[in-house]
Amino acid sequence: MPVSIGKIVRVVGPTVDVKFEDGTLPKIENALTCDNNGKILYLEVAQQLGDGIVRAVAMDSTDGLTRDKVVKDTGKPICVPVGRQTLGRIFNVVGEIIDGGGPVPEPNKVSSIYAEPPRFDMQSTSSEILETGIKVIDLLAPYSKGGKVGLFGGAGVGKTVLIMELINNIAKAYGGFSVFAGVGERTREGNDLYSEMVESGVIDKEHPEKSKVVLVYGQMNEPPGARAKVAMSALTMAEYFRDKEGQDVLFFVDNIFRFTQAGAELSTLLGRIPSAVGYQPTLATDMGRLQERITSTKNGSITSVQAIYVPADDITDPAPATSFAHLDSTTVLSRQVAEAGIYPAVDALASSAQILSPEVLGQEHYEVAQKVKGILQSYKSLQDIIAILGMEELSEEDKLTVYRARKIEKFLSQPFHVAEVFTGQPGKFVSLKDTIAGFKELVEGKCDDMPEAAFYMVGNMNEAREKAISLREK
């Protein structure tokens, strides 16, 4: 097929208008290439304007681009490398390596970033808990294998640290492959994540094929085209492991809000009329197009964990609200919990999971979780009385509830492996069995004689007991 060649007629920020004289217009979502000061710039066709002109969105900076430059139509959408050759490497939205290492061994083994979601008869619907080693999640809002998890939280409450801990724990516990999409987040965090993965052995720099993770970055400094499409590029790599290798893959997105934000920027640049709060009119469609591909099939599964920034802590904002419809579990991070010094700062009562039922988790786990939530809920309803009248005015039974609730809150904290460098405390992976046993003792009153401080930042109940003894000795 002959290559269509056009010329740039207009450049406005990240949007570029290209005129094709010979009448063969590139299709919507086709990739175009252009030389920009010795570097290949990728553009993606977004609109056909008539008179042989298409409006395309740049995947990198358009600085230095001039009119009359030659643009080639590749005849296909953006394609990225797939397979084990991607392990241990960092890619950008168009599949170029950005970690300074050598090229991929099979440059022709690529896939288009657009794919149809699996058919209904190909999808699988089994319910099984994915053990994370994080007490508050495993007990009160457990993740399901092949499910979608949303991490909701405002700025600076610990979404990225929680994601990094999950990658670390799951790589060690399951040895499965993970794909991480850095969508519009800080470049420094992306660099920290890579360094920590190298240190913890999740990435093997000497033998990348032995690594357990692929990183795909489109960070804050990138134009909106890259931020809007980078999640698709990463998902394409995850789909290959699921469909062709039958793997159970973990797909991390940090941050899904930036995907929506980039879509809103593009929508405005392309002249679409905005909808509520200035978001794009196609918000639900864009989100559904990405989310419907993240699913489990009879071959393998993709379990996704998506950090969702909540603008101004308003959970009803259209961006986080649109994500809710697609999720199986929600882990809500709270500023109040973070201010109390309890990390991970998970709001135990606001977080939820569809698999929190005796049929999936077993009777014991379900009952302990419900009792813990009951005590925390009672404590929450007593807080107004305590604030006005003080603890002395409570009945003995209510006092006991308050003491237990405070111990539960402290015991829900946990030192993280990835935060060791900041806290100086070694991280803890707590098995589900130990988590259930520990909280069962707490709700049954077997720990009523132990001081509150003994439960703060420990792993299992044995560690809390050892800490209680050392506190008494002091």
UniProtKB/Swiss-Prot annotation:
GO cellular component annotations of the record: plasma membrane; proton-transporting ATP synthase complex
EC number(s) per entry: 7.1.2.2
Keywords: ATP synthesis, ATP-binding, Cell inner membrane, Cell membrane, CF(1), Hydrogen ion transport, Ion transport, Membrane, Nucleotide-binding, Translocase, Transport
Keyword Transport attributed: yes
One Gene Ontology term of the molecular function aspect: proton-transporting ATP synthase activity, rotational mechanism
Positions annotated to bind ATP: 153-160
Gene3D superfamilies tied to this protein: 2.40.10.170, Bovine Mitochondrial F1-atpase, Atp Synthase Beta Chain, Chain D, domain 3, P-loop containing nucleotide triphosphate hydrolases
Record-linked PANTHER family: ATP SYNTHASE, ATP SYNTHASE SUBUNIT BETA, MITOCHONDRIAL
Family of the protein in this entry: Belongs to the ATPase alpha/beta chains family.
Protein name (record): ATP synthase subunit beta
Organism, as annotated: Neorickettsia sennetsu (strain ATCC VR-367 / Miyayama) (Ehrlichia sennetsu)
Annotated gene: atpD
